[in-house]
Amino acid sequence: SETKLFCKFNREIERGTTLTYKPVFKENKEFVQCCYLDNRLGVWNALELCETITDGAIAFSCWEEHGGGTAGFLARFLYEKYNVSKALISDITWITEGVHHGNGVVISLRDTGIPRKIFVDQILAHAKESGIPFQTEVEGSGGSDGTEIQKIPYPIDWCFIGAPEDNVHTPAEKVHKKDIESMVNLYRYLLEKL
């Protein structure tokens, strides 16, 4: 069923006014649910990694949803200054026909951007040896900061890895706790191995 969103006011809203969803955080044994989980969980995962990372960089980008975000600039800076040539994109993907709640974090094999196969194969091999639950996706649309990194003239490998969510871009985005746990655990494992 399709959800309809609307604003009910006694006056007309001025064009260009920024509107946001009112956060109503819900949690049960299996799921967390709230607006903007696609942004919040990617950042939360990266912050969790700050507790254990010893050799690497964590960067926070913006404007990914609009294209032309800061990922390309950040990747260039990290490559030129610190010779960082591998990037893991910590974000949230969508529940689709082949991606389900509770089956683990999702390793994206491609979306509108196509990461280098040898790097993705390396990640898949590490994921298999880790024993951490994961699933894979192949998408023909959508994109991530990886797509922006792919467009810059630097040899930076990238891969999108994130928990899947339902009700994308609504006030009721929903993610399974097992998928969040496997996301954090796989990132920790990969940061040690890559």
Model-derived features: where do they sit?
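N-terminal hydrophobic/helix-forming segments and targeting peptides
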Residues: 1-194
